[in-house]
């Protein structure tokens, strides 16, 4: 080379752009416009806290970064009002909330610390980790939303847990050293849950019902596996498994030219695990996930409603109510692998007949006494709580 240097914050092949330069700012907005004009729905703003640098700081969350985001948002709102900016900032919610601004920066932001605590709660069979992080999540401006997720294209990050919790997660979910990467676990959802259909359904039900917009990682809807023999994060980035045909239907190219090899192991191999086969099986995870998403879409409270956790008598049960006007939903989740009873204080809804959403079954009327439910291991209920009392129907 020429013996010259450039600044980079992450990999050596990722030079940092100089946002101090107005020409760089304009060029980036031009790049955004190029893709927006092609019809893209929005952008995930990767590592958004690090746009600007300033001597004497750690270069995170600087005021000029927020000023530039406001400019980007203003330009997008003017010409592309139906598009979304999703902030990716691997920080605590109290810091990330700044990227909403006053509703004039990003529309959405990922909620990172919730994800490992879902895994922790189910393995410990106690709701406390989920309850704690949700209670620490600040309010956000109207028109903004958290993006919640179970897995993504990186490792399951363990940056925002204690050392003790990190060791626990490694021991429970990363038995092989190859499963670890950076400060996290590089595994997909299905292998993390040992391919347990019950657990995958419970995790997905939590993803679709907790506060925020669900971000579903490709392949998790069919229970795709990973390849821990591939380097760094590539193990969870293998081609989508569409069919049992050449290259899993992802491409017709020579298999050696694929960006990564398709999964070919006995459990998650593409020949048996693919979209085509699951579309032909009415009981498949894919059909179940589509039904759950359809159910969610019929209840606006899941997207914009308030969230209130109920103090369930059983610590293995996570129960909460989502409300948006007359659209009221009760969600009850059993984090234990064993059947569990629970008594809920539903006196506020006395006289209401809960209706289970997926089957339409009417459950016993809510009275003044604690409301008793029993749930199978890793089971859950979604109930509507109709505004009309039973005697008014």
Cite the ranges covered by each PLM segment.
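Active-site and adjacent substrate-binding regions of carbohydrate-active enzymes
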Residues: 1-393
């Amino acid at each position: 080379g020429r013996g010259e240097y450039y600044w980079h914050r992450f990999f050596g092949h990722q030079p940092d752009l100089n946002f101090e330069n107005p020409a760089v700012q304009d060029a980036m907005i031009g790049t955004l416009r190029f893709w927006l004009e092609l019809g893209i729905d929005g952008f995930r703003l990767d590592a958004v806290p690090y746009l600007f640098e300033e001597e004497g700081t750690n270069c995170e969350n600087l005021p000029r970064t927020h000023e530039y985001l406001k400019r980007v948002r203003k330009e997008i709102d003017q010409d592309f009002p139906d598009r979304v900016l999703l902030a990716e900032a691997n920080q605590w919610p109290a810091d990330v909330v700044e990227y909403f601004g006053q509703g004039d920066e990003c529309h959405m932001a990922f909620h990172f610390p919730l994800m490992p605590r879902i895994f922790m709660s189910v393995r410990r069979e106690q709701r406390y980790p989920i309850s704690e992080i949700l209670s620490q999540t600040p309010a956000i401006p109207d028109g903004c939303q958290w993006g919640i997720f179970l897995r993504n294209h990186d490792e399951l990050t363990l940056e925002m847990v204690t050392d003790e919790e990190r060791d626990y997660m490694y021991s429970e979910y990363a038995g092989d050293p190859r499963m670890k990467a950076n400060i996290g676990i590089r595994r997909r959802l299905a292998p993390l849950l040992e391919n347990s259909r019950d657990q995958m359904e419970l995790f997905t039900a939590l993803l679709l019902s907790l506060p925020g917009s669900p971000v579903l990682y490709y392949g998790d809807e069919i229970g795709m596996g990973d390849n821990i023999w591939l380097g760094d994060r590539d193990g969870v980035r293998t081609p989508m498994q569409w069919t049992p045909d050449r290259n899993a239907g992802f491409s017709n190219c020579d298999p050696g030219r694929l960006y990564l090899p398709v999964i070919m192991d006995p459990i998650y191999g593409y020949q048996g695990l693919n979209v085509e086969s699951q579309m032909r099986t009415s009981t498949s995870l894919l059909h179940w996930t589509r039904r759950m998403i359809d159910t969610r879409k019929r209840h606006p409270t899941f997207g914009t409603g308030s969230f209130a956790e109920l103090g369930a008598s059983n610590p293995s049960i996570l129960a909460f109510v989502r409300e948006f006007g007359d659209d009221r939903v009760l969600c009850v989740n059993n984090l234990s692998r064993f059947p569990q009873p629970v008594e809920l204080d539903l006196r506020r809804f006395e006289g209401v007949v809960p209706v289970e959403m997926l089957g339409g079954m009417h459950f016993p009327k809510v009275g003044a006494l604690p409301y008793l439910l029993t749930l199978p291991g890793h089971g859950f209920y979604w109930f509507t709580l109709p505004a009309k009392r039973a005697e008014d129907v």
